[in-house]
Every structure is written in C-alpha cells, then in structure tokens.
C-alpha cells in the first residue's frame, strides 16, 4: 500500500514539473506568435444607392415629399456606417456611390466617394417625374461598379423604388438584377411608401428575401418618421455578410515545434461495415442472337367505329339560269328487273393461335453476407463515475525539456462569466485530435445472468425478386455520443520501442485474475443487394387450338348501289290536257324591303344628327400615374362621346359640320395630337381608328404646357368663323411643379368653353380641385368630380356630356316610309374578354337553354378569337350559368380554343334552379376574371353579357354592380321575353339603357339582324 502511494506522489511531481516547464516556455513563445500575426484584415465596403425619382414616386401628394424623405433616409443610413474593427478581427471601411432614375439615369455620385461629397451631391438632385425604367438603372449601376472594381471590395446596393415599371427597354428587372448578382453585388430593395408592387421589389432583391427584402421601407407606416428598424436590420446584414467575405483564419495556422513521440495506442475496436461500393462498369454488348422463326399471322382486326356525321357544308352560290330545253318525247316504261337470290352466309372462322409466353426473368445476384457478431454476454453495468468540472480549453503549448519537480499550486476558483459575444460565422473544420490518454482501470464487474431466449418469429412470405438497386446516399453524421462508462482493462498492446532506462520503481501489487466469458451477440448484417437479372428463358410451346368463335353480330345496312344507266329515249307521246292553274306566288318586295336593301348596300339613306358648326378638343392625361387601364377608359370615353355628336364633317376645312381633335400629353416633348383639320379624319370610323392607335406615354405630368399646346397647335391654327369651340380636359389635377402654372388658364378668355374632369389616379390619390378650377376658368359648374375612371363611360355621364357639347341637335332624315337604325362602324380587332352570364332558373326552360347555348357558340365562331391566352389582340369567351346563391356553374373559363368551347357547351347541363344574378356576378369575377390561370388579360376590355329577363333575387345586386365598376366591366344585357324587370336590367347595365337589348323571345337570338347588331355592339 505504501509503495502505491509513493508511485502516485512521484507521478504527480513529474507532471507538475513538466507543466511548470511548459508555462515558462509558453510565455515568450506566445509573445513571439502575437508579434508574427498580421494586422487586422482590411474589409473595404462600397454601398451604392439607386433612387427612383419617377412620377409614380415623386408625384405623390405633396409633390416630391417622398424624395425629401429619401434625402433624409440615406444620410441617416450612412451616418451609422462607421469605420470599425468588427468582432476585433476585420477592419470595416465604407465608401459610397449613387444614381437616380426615371426613364433616364443620372449618376450623382460615382462609386468610391467619401461621405461628405456623397451627401453634398445627394442634396443637389431633383426628380425627373417621368416613366419608370428600373432595368436600365440596374444595368447602369452594374456597369459603374464593374469599372471601379478593386480587389477585396464587398459591394452592396440599396434600391429605393415602389416596384412599378412602365417599360423594360434594357431587358427587364429580373435579367439586370441577375447580372448584378453575377458581378458580386448584393441588392437590398426598400419601398418609399405603402403604394408598392411587392413582386417588382422581390425581383430586384437578392436571395434569400428574408435578408434582402424583409419589408424594408424608408418611413414607418402612416407616419413621416424614418424607419430606423430598416436601417439597423440592413446594416446588420451588411456587416455580417462582409465579415464572411473578408475574414480569413491566418494567425491560428502557425506551426509549433514537434512534440515528443507518443505511446503506442490501444488496439481499436472493430469497425463498422463499409459503404457499398460503386457499381462496376457496364459490361460489353452481347453478341447478337440467332434470327428467330417467322411468326404466325395475327388475328383479323375488329371493324372500326362508324365515323361521325360531317358538318353541313356552306350554301353554294345561286347558279345562273340555264337555257330552256326542247320538249322531250315520252319514253317507254322499262321492265322491272328480277330480284337476285340472297348470298350464302360464311362459316365462322377458327380461333387464332395463342401468343407466345413471356420471357422468364433472370435471377438476381446474391447479396453480401453480413459479418458475424462477436459472441458473448453483456456484463452488469458498473457504477457511474463522478462528473468532473469542465475546464476551459487552453492553447496547445510547445513541448519543453523535462524540468525539476515544482510545488503544486492551490486550485483556482472559477473566473467571472464573460460578456456574451456576437454570433460568429461558422468556423472552419478543425484538425483531427490526438488519441486521448488511457482512463483509470475500472473495477471488474460480476458476470450477469444469461437472458432468456427470444421467441421464434413467423416465417415470412417469400418476397418478389427485385431489380438491382443503386447504392443509397450516405447517411447524415450521427450526433456526438455521451462519454462512455469506465471501461475494463484493454488487451495488451504491441510492444513499443525500448525507452530510456528509468529509475527502478517500487514493486506493484499483484492483480486479480480476469474473467473469460463470451461477449454479446453482434448485430445482424445488412440485407444483401438483389442479384442480377437471370438469362432469358426459351421460347414456349405452341398452345392448343382454340374453340370456334361465336357467331358474329349482324352487320350494318349497306349503302344503296349506284343508279342504273338511263334507258333509250322513247317515242314522242300524245300532248296532255291543259293543266289547272297553280297556287298564288309569293308577294313582291315592298318599298320598305327595297329601301332596306339600298340602305344595307350603300348606307346613303340614314338619318344624321347635326350639331352645327362645332369644334371639340379632348385633352387627355397619358402620364405614368394614370395607368394603362385608365388610359384605355379615357379613349373609350372620347369615342362614346363623339358617337353622340353625329356625323363628322367630310371636309375638315368646310365652314360647317363637326370636327374633333385630341391631345394626349405626358411630360414636355411627348405631346401627340389628332388635328382638327386632318384630311384623313373624314368619317366617324376613321376618327375611332386614330383614337385607338394612341399609345400610353407613361411619363411625367405637364398639364399647363399641354393646354397651351392644345390652343396654339389645334384651336388657334385651324379656327373657323362663327364656330363654337369646346375643350374637355381629363386629369387628376396634379402636375409637375416645374411647369408654368400660368398656362393652366391657356384656354380662358379665348371664347373656348372648358370642361375639367378630375379623377383619382391609379394609386387612388384624390384630385386637386384648385387646379381644376383654374383649368375651367374659375367656373365651378364646369368642373366634374369622379372617383373611378370607369365612371367616365357610364351612360348618365355620356348623356351629360352630350347635353354640354350639343344641347340643340338637329336630326335630318330622308323622306322614307321605313325607319332604320343608325349605322355603326364595323368591328375592329382589339383585346376583348367576353363573359356570358346565362340565367339557369326554371323560368328559362330546357328549349330556351339550348337556344342560348347555340347563340354563345355562334358568337364564338363569328368573332376573331385570340391565338393564345396572352395575345394582345382579338377576343376570348367564357360562360357562367347562375342559379341559386350556391349554384354557379362555370361551363368554360376564358378561352380562345373553339374546339374546347364546342365540347364544353355540348356537356353543359341546364340547372333548372332559382335565380340570384348578384351571386353569379361575384362568382364570375372571382372564378373567371381573377383566376390565376387564364384570368382576364391586363389590357383587354372586359365585357359581361347577361342573358336574363331580370326576374331574380335582389340579394347583393347593388354590391355586384359596384364590383363590376371596380373591375371596369362593360355590361350588355339581352332581355328576352315579354315579362322583364327593367329596374334590375338597368342596374346590371350600370345605368346604360342603350346596353339593354329587349327581344320578344329566344328565337330572336338567331335572327341575322339582331345577331349583326349585337356583334357590332360588343366590338
């Protein structure tokens, strides 16, 4: 016992001496290592700001308020970007650059500018207030950074925009953002206000969007304060990403002196079974087999299905009358032919031979045999050891020479807890640690009792032979296991190298003899892989001859045979007696019929509406804030009003008649006009075509200059004597502050009657009434206020404008006994989406349902359908049958496929239910118009055609009318039958009685006159 105690004390003294020697050597060596470490890693960061100063941003009320907030947001942002040592490992330094854009780009600070010059240049920019070409701004930014690129610089870009674009001349946002990311630029997308397009911002931002988009905004919602949280979050991401780019572990890679040779380690445990090897190379192609015998003929095929009946051909043209033939002689009556005997019935055919049996599959390869486990029984679990205190990880010191034994110091207490550090980047994988020292010898455990033998499992069914599988993917690395229990004495290791002769130690106590018993049974090996496919089997024997087949079914009747040849001409017969007088003939054409044909042929007998000598100039806003859909409604308003003014002067230079001109405007230099004296505008149809060809400019808003342009270029240069001049101005009342406000009265005091129409813009910003009063020459009665652009085309407002422009019209009709309708211009191709809403109530009836279904198909065949779903021209058609509140049936969505429309109509069933048209309208908008697949096109005119008598439930009727106005729906109502509810029909037509076609029954749908009138109306 005394000898064991002396051994422990001697070992302790030796270890203490070694530790003291190491501490003496570590101190100067650590100082030398710190002196050899390089300085903190330099990490230059360039931040580029891209500011949107287009009209959709800067014209928000009040003007340039969002640009003012940008000029506050950016300096506050960069004031928090200080040069610093981040995590005491990288030295961050900041430089800046920036540009602002609209439909043009201006670089106000090149990349690499310092803070003072950048802020000075930022405060000097002014907004463009025109269109939005974001892709060109991103392309310009990328080129600027590429030219100024320096090695080791981290680039970030902060793009402040609302996501709206008016054009993509540089390839689109996605393309340019991807090119910027390829250049190593990380893009943050920040919204200047709440009127944003989120998808556009996500197209700009780098991924993941949780870092580079994350609802960043310059201002707090419903406030004018800078969003400090956005600044903090973006800066945090910038620093962390820059740290990951710049930080390199270099000081920790200094090699130390080699340590002493270690003891030979214990023999390792048996390793696990290795991963399956990769499949071997594909074997060479086998030799071609011998040619097989010719097979027996196959059985006779069954007769094909009878073909569908073809469609009726088009009516042929009426042939010219032939010359009168000579009187023929009566021929002799021929003899009747004999009826031939029936043919013999054929014998049934023999049953064909059976097919060859399938080839047998090849046997699979034998799987690998699992390794046999070591036998043995598990010992009893030893007592758990005490948990030692976890020490802090120290630096690996250099191995020193053995020193004299030192005095053991007292055990130090735990140090204070350090501050929580910022989360660092993921560390590089460390080097593999050296083998640990042997643990203390554990006590020998008593042998445990042998466990009972388990029950035998049931014999499973033999599995099917599977194909050879590919090796599975490598499994994830298992979690770090818990520290093991105190182990038993290991096997003796191999003899190590002979060491230096040491001092003779005391004699040790003899150990107890160890137990020898088998270990636990090893785990079963993994299941072997299936073997390869076996060789193909030989050809099977011929099967037995089959029994005779059943008697065939009776065939279909054959087509009649060809007609026989005519017999020879017989002798002339005796003249017959005089015949009786025939039935009375059809009545001749009436004067009305003749005049109808004349009017349909030449159109020279129509009534004309004359407003006297009248000049009308429409000034319409074509700026970015209006939006494409609202601009289209402006053009439709102009066409609808001019339709009410009657015929246009055939000679624009004559002193009488109506002339119409149009000015569409955006920013300076973009004005376009249809002149009053344009010789090409000599009819209503030519004027409509010119208006439809006007394209949305999508720039700034220079209303005062546009009014001056309208007077100087249209009214002043072509004014006629004794002619009333009207001007209709459509705008939201706001304009670019750089434009001269004095020109708002450019049409006043010039004998011009001005009507100013103020409507909210695409962002639902209210118009400014003060500017509207200036445009209308301070006459409040000539100012019209509206909320939605769809109110422009309402029937009531069109009537009001007709009364303003032509208060005392003169209707001149030819003296004809028959009346006719006003001529309508032919249908022209443009994008139209037509949704038919068919009343499926019990009042309709099965027969009328089929007539309505045929009418929808005829309309689809008559219209020029689109070539694809995103075709910018032509029409698409949809059908919804509505019944009770929960009984709406979409027969087919908006489609351009005539075959699909025909098949859907054939399978549509009559509902025979109640009628709630309000629920039908809401369902049509949600399920057809707003459908993510095949919904209404963005720039197409949306038309709802109702087939109903108006006798329906009034639930949500007015709400559905409001929904149609919000969707800019153009309604048409086909009121069929004598018992109709005009109040409901007027509500469905949004107050436009001209859009209600009242016919006596559903048979009228097939009348050519009604059908042509309907087609011209919806076009």
UniProtKB/Swiss-Prot annotation:
Ranges of biased composition (kind: Basic and acidic residues): 306-318, 365-377, 419-429, 524-557
UniProt modified residues of type Phosphoserine: 705
UniProt cross-references to Gene3D superfamilies, sorted A to Z: 6-Phosphogluconate Dehydrogenase, domain 3, von Willebrand factor, type A domain
Membrane topology, as annotated: Peripheral membrane protein
Motif interval(s): Cell attachment site: 366-368, 426-428, 489-491, 498-500, 539-541
Stated consequence of mutating residue 837 to P: In UCMD1B; prevents collagen VI assembly
Signal peptide: 1-20
Biased composition, class Pro residues, residue ranges: 559-569
Subcellular locations according to the entry: Secreted, Extracellular space, Extracellular matrix; Membrane
Region feature (Triple-helical region): 257-590
Keywords annotated in UniProt: Cell adhesion, Collagen, Congenital muscular dystrophy, Disease variant, Extracellular matrix, Glycoprotein, Hydroxylation, Membrane, Phosphoprotein, Repeat, Secreted, Signal
Residue positions the entry lists as glycosylated: 140, 327, 630, 785, 897, 954
Main location: secreted
GO cellular component: collagen type VI trimer; collagen-containing extracellular matrix; endoplasmic reticulum lumen; extracellular exosome; extracellular region; extracellular space; extracellular vesicle; protein-containing complex
Positions of the VWFA domain: 46-234, 615-805, 833-1014
SUPFAM superfamilies tied to this protein: vWA-like
GO molecular function list: collagen binding; extracellular matrix structural constituent conferring tensile strength
Biased composition (Low complexity): 287-305
One GO term of the biological process aspect: neuron apoptotic process
InterPro entries: Collagen, Collagen-VI/PIF, VWF_A, vWFA_dom_sf
Assigned protein family: Belongs to the type VI collagen family.
Subunit structure: Trimers composed of three different chains: alpha-1(VI), alpha-2(VI), and alpha-3(VI) or alpha-5(VI) or alpha-6(VI). Interacts with CSPG4.
Disease listed for this protein: Bethlem myopathy 1B: A form of Bethlem myopathy, a slowly progressive muscular dystrophy characterized by joint contractures, most frequently affecting the elbows and ankles, and muscle weakness and wasting involving the proximal and extensor muscles more than the distal and flexor ones. The clinical onset more often occurs in childhood or adulthood, but it can be prenatal with decreased fetal movements or neonatal with hypotonia. The hallmark of Bethlem myopathy is long finger flexion contractures. Inheritance can be autosomal dominant or autosomal recessive.
The protein's name: Collagen alpha-2(VI) chain
Gene of this entry: COL6A2
């Amino acid at each position: 016992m005394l000898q064991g105690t002396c051994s422990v004390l001697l070992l302790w003294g030796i270890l203490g001496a070694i530790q003291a020697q190491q501490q003496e050597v570590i101190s100067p060596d650590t100082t030398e290592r710190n002196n050899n470490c390089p300085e903190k890693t330099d990490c230059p960061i360039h931040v580029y700001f891209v500011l949107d100063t287009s009209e959709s941003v800067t014209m928000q009320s009040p003007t340039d308020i969002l640009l003012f907030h940008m000029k506050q947001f950016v300096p506050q942002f960069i004031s928090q970007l200080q040069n610093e040592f981040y995590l005491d490992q990288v030295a961050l330094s900041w430089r800046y650059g920036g540009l602002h854009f609209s439909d043009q780009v201006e670089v106000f600070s090149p990349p690499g500018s310092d803070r003072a010059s950048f802020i000075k240049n930022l405060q000097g920019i002014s907004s463009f207030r025109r269109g939005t070409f974001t892709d060109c701004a991103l392309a310009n930014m990328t080129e600027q950074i590429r030219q100024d690129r320096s090695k080791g610089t981290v680039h970030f870009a902060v793009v402040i925009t609302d996501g709206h674009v008016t054009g993509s001349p540089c390839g689109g946002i996605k393309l340019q953002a991807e090119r910027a990311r390829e250049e190593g630029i990380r893009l943050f997308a920040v919204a200047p206000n709440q009127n944003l397009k989120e998808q556009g911002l996500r197209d700009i931002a780098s991924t993941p969007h949780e870092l580079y988009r994350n609802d960043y905004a310059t201002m707090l919602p419903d406030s004018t304060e800078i969003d400090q949280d956005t600044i903090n979050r973006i800066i945090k991401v910038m620093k962390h990403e820059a740290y990951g780019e710049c930080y390199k572990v270099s000081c920790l890679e200094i090699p130390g002196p080699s340590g002493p040779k270690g003891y030979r380690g214990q023999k390792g445990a048996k390793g696990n079974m290795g991963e399956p090897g990769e499949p071997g190379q594909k074997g060479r192609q086998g030799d071609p087999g011998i040619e097989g015998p010719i097979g027996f003929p196959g059985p006779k095929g069954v007769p094909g299905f009878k073909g569908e009946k073809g469609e009726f051909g088009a009516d042929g043209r009426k042939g010219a009358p032939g010359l009168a033939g000579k009187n023929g002689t009566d021929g002799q009556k021929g003899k009747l032919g004999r009826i031939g005997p029936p043919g013999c019935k054929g014998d049934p055919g023999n049953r064909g031979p059976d097919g060859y049996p399938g080839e047998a599959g090849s046997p699979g390869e034998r799987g690998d045999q699992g390794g046999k486990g070591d036998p043995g029984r598990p010992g009893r679990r030893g007592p758990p050891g005490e948990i030692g205190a976890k020490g802090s990880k120290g630096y690996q010191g250099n191995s020193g020479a053995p020193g004299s034994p030192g005095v053991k110091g007292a055990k130090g207490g735990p140090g204070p807890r350090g501050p929580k550090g910022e989360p660092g980047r993921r560390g590089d994988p460390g080097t593999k640690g050296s083998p640990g020292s042997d643990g203390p010898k554990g006590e020998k455990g008593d042998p445990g009792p042998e466990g009972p033998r388990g029950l035998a499992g049931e014999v499973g069914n033999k599995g099917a032979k599977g194909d050879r599988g590919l090796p599975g993917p490598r499994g994830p690395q298992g979690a770090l296991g818990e520290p093991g229990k105190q182990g038993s004495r290991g096997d003796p290791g191999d003899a190590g190298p002979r060491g230096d002769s040491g001092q003779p130690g005391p004699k040790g106590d003899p150990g107890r003899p160890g137990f020898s018993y088998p270990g636990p049974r090893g785990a079963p090996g993994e299941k072997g892989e299936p073997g390869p496919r076996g060789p193909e089997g030989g050809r099977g024997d011929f099967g037995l001859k089959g029994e005779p087949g059943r008697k065939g079914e009776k065939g279909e009747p054959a087509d009649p045979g060809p007609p026989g040849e005519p017999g020879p001409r017989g002798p002339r017969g005796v003249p017959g007696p005089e015949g009786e007088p025939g039935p009375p003939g059809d009545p001749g054409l009436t004067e009305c019929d003749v005049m109808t044909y004349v009017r349909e042929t030449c159109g020279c007998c129509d009534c004309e509406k004359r407003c006297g000598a009248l000049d009308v100039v429409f000034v319409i806003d074509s700026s970015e804030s209006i939006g494409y859909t609202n601009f289209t409604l402006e053009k439709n308003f102009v066409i609808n009003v001019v339709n009410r003014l009657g015929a246009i002067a055939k000679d624009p230079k004559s002193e009488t008649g109506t002339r119409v001109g149009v000015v569409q405007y955006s920013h300076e230099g973009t004005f376009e006009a249809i002149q009053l004296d344009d010789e090409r505008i000599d009819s209503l149809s030519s004027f409509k075509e010119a208006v439809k060809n006007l394209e949305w400019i999508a720039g700034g808003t220079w209303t005062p200059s546009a009014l001056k342009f309208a007077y100087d270029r249209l009214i002043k240069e072509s004014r006629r004597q004794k002619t009333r001049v009207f001007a209709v101005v459509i705008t939201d009342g706001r304009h670019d502050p750089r434009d001269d406000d004095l020109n708002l009265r450019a049409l006043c005091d010039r004998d011009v009657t001005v009507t100013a129409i103020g409507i909210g813009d695409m962002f639902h910003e209210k118009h400014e009434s003060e500017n509207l009063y200036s445009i209308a020459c301070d006459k409040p009665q000539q100012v019209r206020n509206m909320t939605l652009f769809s109110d422009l085309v309402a029937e009531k407002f069109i009537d009001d404008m007709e009364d303003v422009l032509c208060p005392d019209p003169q209707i001149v009709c030819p003296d004809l006994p028959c009346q006719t309708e006003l001529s309508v211009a032919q249908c022209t191709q443009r994008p139209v989406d037509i949704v038919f809403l068919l009343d499926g109530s019990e009042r309709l009836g099965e027969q009328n349902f089929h007539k309505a279904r045929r009418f929808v198909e005829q309309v689809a065949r008559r219209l020029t359908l689109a070539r694809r779903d995103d075709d910018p021209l032509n029409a698409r058609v949809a059908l919804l049958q509505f019944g009770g509140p929960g009984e709406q049936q979409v027969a087919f969505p908006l489609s351009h496929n005539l075959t699909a429309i025909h098949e859907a109509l054939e399978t549509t069933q009559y509902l025979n239910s109640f009628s709630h048209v309000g629920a039908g309208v809401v369902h049509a908008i949600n399920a057809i118009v707003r459908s993510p697949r095949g919904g209404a096109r963005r720039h197409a005119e949306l038309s709802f055609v109702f087939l109903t008598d108006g006798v329906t439930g009034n639930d949500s009727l007015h709400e559905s009318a409001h929904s149609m106005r919000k969707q800019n729906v153009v309604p048409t109502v086909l009121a069929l039958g004598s018992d109709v509810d005009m109040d409901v029909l007027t509500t469905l037509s949004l107050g436009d009685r001209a859009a209600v076609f009242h016919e006596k029954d559903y048979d009228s749908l097939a009348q050519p006159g009604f059908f042509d009138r309907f087609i011209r109306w919806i076009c």
